[in-house]
Regions:
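Bilobed periplasmic-binding protein-like "clamshell/Venus-flytrap" ligand-binding domains
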Residues: 16-29, 184-195, 274-282
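Short, charged, surface-exposed loops that flank catalytic or proteolytic processing sites
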Residues: 1-8, 253-266
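Flexible glycine/proline-enriched surface loops and loop-helix/loop-strand junctions
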Residues: 20-27, 62-72, 92, 110, ...
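Periplasmic solute-binding protein
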Residues: 1, 9, 28-67, 155-164, ...
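C-terminal lobe and pocket-closing loops
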Residues: 122-134, 147-249, 281
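Extracytoplasmic/periplasmic substrate-binding proteins
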Residues: 38-41, 45-46, 80-174
C-alpha cells in the first residue's frame, strides 16, 4: 500500500483505466467546503498546518489557540506542493470529480468504479454492510500518504455533544445522564454492532467482538499508537469555516484551469489575511 504521495500517484496511475470505466482515485473536490477540507488535509500531508502553529513532538501545538495569536499559512512552499499534488490527483480521477463531495465519492467506490478513495470511517458502512459491493472485504485502511519529509497523518473528524447554555436548570441532570449513556462503552459497542464504523473509546476498539466486525478498528487503533491521529490539520478556531470555504473556492478555480497554483495560493492567502484582520482586530 502507498505510504507516500509519490507512491499514491503511481498506484492511482496504474489502477486508472477509464476505457473500462475504472478510475484510480476519488477525493472531495466539489467547490467550497468539500475541496477546502481536502486542501487542509493535503497541506498536512506535506507537513504543515493551515495556521502558524509551533512544532512539537508528534505534530503541532494547539494548546494556545484561545489566545488568538495566529495567522493562516496558505501561500507557502508546502502549500504549493499540496496544490500541485491535487492537480496530479486530478489526472487519475473520475470526470465528475469536481462535483464530488463525501457521498458522491463513496458511492462509486462502493460500486467498484474507483480503486482508491480518501474518506472518513463514518461512511465505510456504505460498502462494508453491502454484500453486493465489490469493496466489501477488499478494502484496507491507511493514514494519508505523506509528502517528502513529512510523516503520515490521519486527520481526526467527529462531532461534539454538549449542553445548550439556555437549557432550563431542572433539565440539566437528565441531559448530563443522556450524554454519559450515549458515550458509555456499552452504548459505543451497541452502535458498532448495529453498523457504525466509528468509535472514540480504546476499550471498545480493543473488544474482540468489535475487532471481528471490521478491520477498521484495529487499523485506527494502530494509527493512534503510532501517533498518526491528529486534529491539528483542521484546528478549532472561529475562522476555520470561512477559511475552508475560501480554499474550496480558489483551489476549485485552479483545478478547473482558470488560474495557476501560485495565483490560487496568493488569492486564498489574501482573503484569509482579510478574515484574520476582521475577526482579531475589531
Amino acid at each position: 500500500p502507498p505510504t507516500t504521495t509519490d507512491a499514491l500517484l503511481n498506484a492511482a496511475k496504474a489502477l486508472h483505466d477509464p476505457k473500462r470505466g475504472q478510475h484510480g482515485i476519488a477525493w472531495n473536490a466539489a467547490r467550497g467546503t468539500a475541496l477546502g477540507h481536502t486542501f487542509l488535509m493535503a497541506l498536512a500531508d506535506f507537513g504543515q498546518p493551515i495556521l502558524d502553529l509551533p512544532p512539537i513532538a508528534g505534530g503541532f501545538d494547539t494548546r494556545h489557540l484561545s489566545e488568538r495569536r495566529y495567522r493562516f499559512t496558505i501561500d507557502t512552499d508546502a502549500g504549493l506542493r499540496a496544490a500541485e499534488f491535487l492537480l496530479e490527483l486530478l489526472k487519475y480521477s473520475p470526470p465528475e470529480i469536481l462535483s464530488m463531495s463525501w457521498y458522491e465519492r463513496i458511492r462509486p467506490y462502493a460500486a467498484g468504479r474507483i480503486a482508491m478513495t480518501y474518506g472518513y470511517t463514518l461512511l465505510a458502512p456504505y460498502f462494508e454492510l453491502d454484500k453486493n459491493s465489490p469493496a466489501q472485504g477488499n478494502t484496507g485502511y491507511l493514514p494519508h500518504p505523506a509528502g517528502s519529509g513529512a510523516n503520515p497523518v490521519a486527520p481526526v473528524g467527529g462531532y461534539i455533544m454538549g449542553l445548550p447554555a439556555n437549557l432550563p436548570v431542572d433539565r440539566v441532570p437528565a441531559a448530563v445522564e443522556a450524554l454519559i449513556v450515549f458515550t458509555s462503552p456499552a452504548a459505543q459497542k451497541l452502535y458498532v454492532q448495529n453498523g457504525s464504523r466509528t468509535n472514540p473509546r480504546y476499550s471498545v476498539g480493543s473488544d474482540p467482538d468489535v475487532r471481528r466486525i471490521s478491520p477498521i478498528f484495529e487499523a485506527v487503533d494502530a494509527m493512534s499508537w503510532r501517533d498518526e491521529l491528529q486534529f491539528w490539520p483542521r484546528p478549532p478556531v472561529p475562522e476555520i469555516g470561512e477559511i475552508i470555504q475560501i480554499c474550496g473556492e480558489e483551489f476549485h478555480n485552479m483545478l478547473r484551469g482558470i488560474i495557476p497554483p501560485q495565483e490560487a495560493l496568493r488569492r486564498a492567502q489574501q482573503r484569509a489575511d482579510a478574515v484574520i484582520k476582521k475577526t482579531q482586530f475589531t
